From Swiss-Prot:
GO biological process, one term: ERAD pathway
Region listing for Disordered, in residue ranges: 355-392
GO cellular component: endoplasmic reticulum membrane; lipid droplet
Membrane topology: Peripheral membrane protein
Keyword annotations: Endoplasmic reticulum, Lipid droplet, Membrane
Protein's recorded name: Lipid droplet-regulating VLDL assembly factor AUP1
Classification via SMART domains: CUE (SM00546)
UniProt record similarity statement: Belongs to the AUP1 family.
General function of this protein: Plays a role in the translocation of terminally misfolded proteins from the endoplasmic reticulum lumen to the cytoplasm and their degradation by the proteasome. Plays a role in lipid droplet formation. Induces lipid droplet clustering.
Pfam families assigned to the protein according to its UniProt record, in alphabetical order: CUE
């Protein structure tokens, strides 16, 4: 998974970074709050009207006009390309309301794959599948039987299974939506709005709705692509990749292999690294950072990392706990972390030397027993300065090997390990 690529596919920050746009947003904020309250009142009436009127072209026209008052403007290109005989539409996913927007243009049903069922599912415009659908195979079979019925509305599915910002790339299309029907019609969706991002990860649909009412408008561009059918001998995944490439070309973005699971893992990693970065900036006292890190540990994984960090801290007391923890999150091994930190021992020693008080009396008082014990075993400096770069490099390598051997011996003695077992 490419971190750089996945960072560009999602807007993790709602507000803009541009100071001028942020200033305009602050000036607009009082108007936006008043507009949001007014649109909440109007939105209730839009919901009641959509529930009272039967599904028809008249209802879609009236609701579409009322949604324009709510700030949802829908535009479509080449409406004649929409095939009325198509049983399955596939579309890229940008916001929580993509299915509602497509439903303003043509009647279709979108099954609810995740979330609460019941009234809330119906009110949001989803189709409830029932309690019997558990696995992906059962879901595919249920939707396949639904598409085979002649009196049902077309299905609208999102093969990405999660939202993106729609500006950089598409998530990898899942193959199961393309096993529902061999004939599909791709729909390209592009969403734009001023001031703020159209969607952010981990944001609920209710929060997104309030932000939609807050901004002046949100424009949805819908583009209908010609229908496609799966060729003989073509697998469902190959068919999904072909449709993904066509939609990416239409939107001017790239097709990626990043999945919904990769997005969830990246969000989890960012959530985990955020408090760690905050604790690393609190101060220069390692013990305070360690207590702060242990205080925020709520899972077994954090407790294990903290325990490993304490073991490394006992071997290398001069290294800050924040540095040890950051390296352990990457290596997940005490020995590897000790080796990596020993490579940077000169950096820590130079920082300690800069903070050491001047004067012979203070210097003697600030010396630690560990430094006194390690001084005969370690080789902090070469006996003579090498005349050639090779000699100087060998001198540095010898000091590193001595430091590593001392740290290894101290670790074995601390935990009562045998050298044969450790090797």
């Amino acid at each position: 998974m490419e971190t750089r690529g996945i960072e560009q596919m999602f807007d993790f920050q709602r507000l803009p970074n541009d100071r001028f746009i942020l200033l305009l947003l602050l000036l607009y904020a009082p108007v936006g709050f008043c507009l949001m309250l007014l649109r909440i009142f109007i939105g209730v009436h839009v919901f009641l009207v959509s529930c009272a009127l039967p599904d028809s072209i008249v209802r879609r026209f009236i609701v579409r006009i009322m949604c324009s008052v709510l700030g949802l403007h829908v535009q479509q290109n080449s409406p004649r390309l929409r095939d009325k005989t198509t049983r399955l539409y596939v579309c890229n996913h940008v916001t929580h309301f993509d299915h509602n927007i497509i439903n303003l243009l043509t009647s279709c049903n979108t099954p609810l794959l995740e979330g609460p069922v019941g009234f809330l599912c119906w009110a949001r415009g989803f189709m409830e599948l029932g309690q019997g659908v558990g696995s992906r195979t059962e879901l595919t079979e249920t939707l396949h039987r639904y598409c085979s019925s002649p009196d049902t509305l077309p299905l609208l599915l999102f093969p990405e299974e999660d939202t993106t910002n729609g500006r950089t790339g598409l998530l990898k299309f899942s193959s199961w939506p393309f096993s529902v029907s061999d004939s599909i019609q791709p729909v390209a969706l592009l969403v734009k709005r001023p001031f703020i991002a159209v969607s952010t990860p981990e944001s609920s649909w209710l929060t997104e709705l309030l932000w939609t009412f807050f901004v002046p408008f949100t424009v949805y561009h819908v583009r209908w692509l010609p229908p496609l059918s799966k060729e003989d001998g073509e697998t469902h995944q190959e068919f999904a990749s072909k449709v993904q490439g066509l939609l990416a070309t239409e939107l001017g973005v790239i097709s990626t292999q990043i999945t919904k699971a990769d997005k969830a893992e990246h969000i989890k990693r960012k959530r985990h690294s955020a408090p760690q970065t905050a604790h690393s900036n609190l101060g220069a006292r390692p013990r305070t950072v360690a207590q702060g890190f242990l205080g925020t540990s709520v899972g077994a994984e954090d407790s294990r990392i903290a325990r490993l960090a304490q073991q490394v801290k006992e071997v290398l007391p001069d290294v800050p706990v924040s540095v040890i923890t950051r390296d352990l999150l990457q290596t997940n091994c005490v020995d590897t972390t000790i080796t990596n930190l020993l490579e940077r021992t000169d950096q820590f020693n130079s920082e300690a030397a800069m903070t050491m008080p001047s004067g012979p009396g203070k210097a003697a008082a600030s010396s630690t027993p560990s430094a006194m014990v390690s001084s005969p075993n370690l080789k902090p400096a070469a006996k003579s300065f090498g005349r050639s770069p090779i000699d100087r490099h060998m001198s540095l390598q010898e000091r590193k090997e001595a430091l590593y051997e001392y740290a290894r011996r101290r670790y074995i003695e601390k935990h009562g390990l045998n050298k044969e077992d450790d090797l």
